[in-house]
Amino acid sequence: EFPKFVKAAVKDGLLDKRMADGRFDLKKLAAELDPARDDLSKYLGVVTNKNRYALRRQNGSPIETPQFTHMRIAMGLSYNETDPTAAAIEFYNHMSNLEYVPGGSTRVNAGGSFPQLSNCFLLNVDDDMESIAKAVRDTMWIAKGTGGIGIGFTKLRAAGSPVKTTNTESTGPIPFMKMIDTALFAVSRKGKKAGAAAIYVENWHLNFDQFVDLRQNSGDPYLRTRFANTAVFISDEFMKRVEKDQD
């Protein structure tokens, strides 16, 4: 069944074409599958694999057994090896015996048509519109691939600061953080592992008090985030003043 599964999934665009282009001996890989290893996982692990990581049809129904998932990931990590089949078998044995468990993005995407394998990304937003727009775009693409993102917003000028090019005042970083939050919601991958983000600001920023309220349930919804988390860079000066009980 495994060779048929791979070829059908490639034809339907669910798997990368390299999975069935001849570099793998699919019959040999199928012979290595050991359904008894399903019992090594606890019930919660099996359900989590089904709900978050298993390949699905367009109607949302899973089409992979746990061992199919392990082998699909193993193949997706072995495209460029000297002997892809042997490498995939070695990866499979380690994963199916729970000796090695790859990160979530690798489990979701390896072997698939959108093979983004990294879990974590860092972005730093500069104080200009091009950088802000690029951060929103990058957030959407990374979230599509289930990546987690840390985004630094400290460089953005505070609300009320002059904007020379338009002869107006800046709205500050908070509304742009809301744009990141909305982008995460728009690319939420309902039913599977979703992307995530944490927005970072250093404690000396003039809008720091507004920033720490971002996750509050009450208040102006345009100044709140529901999906993006918040994190703070604490300076040495801040901690020195805490020790001395100073403002």
Predicted regions and their residues:
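Extended catalytic cores of very large enzyme megasubunits
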Residues: 1-247
